[in-house]
Amino acid sequence: MKRICSLFFSSIFFVSLVTFTSSVTAQELERDLIFTPNALPSESHTTSLNLQIRGGSPPMVLPFLDDFAWPSFFEESGVDRPELVRWDSSPVRRTSTFALNPPTIGVVTLDGLDADGYPYVFNSIDAHGWADTLTSREIYLGGLTTNDEVTLSFWYEGGGIGNAPDLGEDSLIVEFKSIGSEGDLWTRVWEDSLDVMSTDAFTQVVIPISDGIYLHNNFQFRFRNYGTLMGNADLWHIDYVFVAENGITGNPIEELAFQYPPFTLLRSFSAMPWTHYSDNPEFYINDTLVVGHTNFGMGPNNQENTGISIQLQDLDPIAFENEFIQNVSVSEGPFSTEYMADLLDAQGVPASILFNPASSDTTAVFEVSLWENEVGYYTNQSAVYDNDSIGFSQVFTDYYAYDDGTAEKAYALEATGGQLAVRYPLAIPDTLDGLLIHFTPFYDNAELETFVIKVWADDAGVPGEQVDTMYQFHSPQYFTEGYDLFAYYAYDNPVPVSGIIHVGFIQ
């Protein structure tokens, strides 16, 4: 019997990008993402450079704090900003879109991928074991006693948007390091094997560091996960790791923080061609941007003042200052704010034409920055790595995109001849040159399998007749240079298109 090989992918570009959430039939497969290429700086997958930290830096002093909003791995900051580094190198990555309801923007995610972004055990259907390890830098605890009430606290969640750990099979543990006569000794001090784990909310854990064997000058702690070794599944997310004296309650320092990174100010798309946007800018701009925050504590900083700025790349800023929430009290815990309502720039231009069509004739990229100034000042930087200021690029070039470009799961058609399409309403007539698709390896290497890319006209909301005939066979291309990279697949010939179209492939 002929074996049918499924092509697992997670996103497609029409010269565009979309993550599929279609319903699954008997001839379709949906799988948690088993492979993710190597990390980009924003979602860093650390590699083994490490001893430059353990061998070249003195132990850290308390308090130890990391909410994973800044680049705290050596591979991100070790050379230029060693004071930001909190961790020894490990096969762990910072993510900002995998978790649900995180305390602050950015978490660290433990999974079944190694330091190169490949499964620890590839081409296997059932491989479990110890996977990722995240180890702190050495911390100076010498001279402290039980009376100092040193504690480790953190927040954690299983699964989130990705695949959750399996009941009775997977676990997350914490270990402390003591010094024995024969070297370092690691002792398990906490474990969650799904007895109390939540897949859509974070739980706080507080662990006393009270035993005298841990109160030494080279103390370290580490997180380890036991689960699948086959890729990006059985996910554990950790946030707001805090070690301090007098910290028995585990309360962090008082502050306001963002929860998620926004990725678009457009109504439906995350990116679109500049000439298409310019045809009707007020239609495509969103009328609001709701952003989630967390308020830790109810002290003097529970007055929130927010701002937003837009800057055309390589040009002077276009000043937008959103202060309509100025001096408003916010409740403790999660809350949200709207950044677009009643927003005007210095010349009174409304937010409905936030990205001025006069900025360019062909393409434009805008840097969008949002901030909270509960600390008493604004920042004009773009994409600041901090939990009270965030940024993203709003891209207008030559493609349409729907989502944020992060692939949490893989999707496939199981049957030969299976067809898949994504719907795009075009602003103006244009010519379609090709698709960008992110494929992910799943069990079998599908590089020798083939598919044909297609484009269909719309028929009452579903694909209708093929717009053009395509014959060119393509094969999946995989990358190891970074996360969520896309391969370009050109149509046999440029295709004139207008109105609503559907793009995809037949395998």
Residue ranges and their predicted role:
Residues A127-T133, D166-L167, H216, G227-E245:
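Extracellular carbohydrate recognition
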